[in-house]
Amino acid sequence: NTEAFFGQGTRLTVV
């Protein structure tokens, strides 16, 4: 459950 944000609103959610 880790959320990472990159650049312009790109969201990567890893459980």
From Swiss-Prot:
Gene, per the UniProt record: TRBJ1-1
GO BP annotation list: adaptive immune response
Keyword Cell membrane: yes
Assigned GO CC terms: T cell receptor complex
Record's protein name: T cell receptor beta joining 1-1
Compartments, as annotated in UniProt: Cell membrane
Quaternary assembly: Alpha-beta TR is a heterodimer composed of an alpha and beta chain; disulfide-linked. The alpha-beta TR is associated with the transmembrane signaling CD3 coreceptor proteins to form the TR-CD3 (TcR or TCR). The assembly of alpha-beta TR heterodimers with CD3 occurs in the endoplasmic reticulum where a single alpha-beta TR heterodimer associates with one CD3D-CD3E heterodimer, one CD3G-CD3E heterodimer and one CD247 homodimer forming a stable octameric structure. CD3D-CD3E and CD3G-CD3E heterodimers preferentially associate with TR alpha and TR beta chains, respectively.
Main location per the UniProt record: membrane
Source organism, top-level taxon: Eukaryota
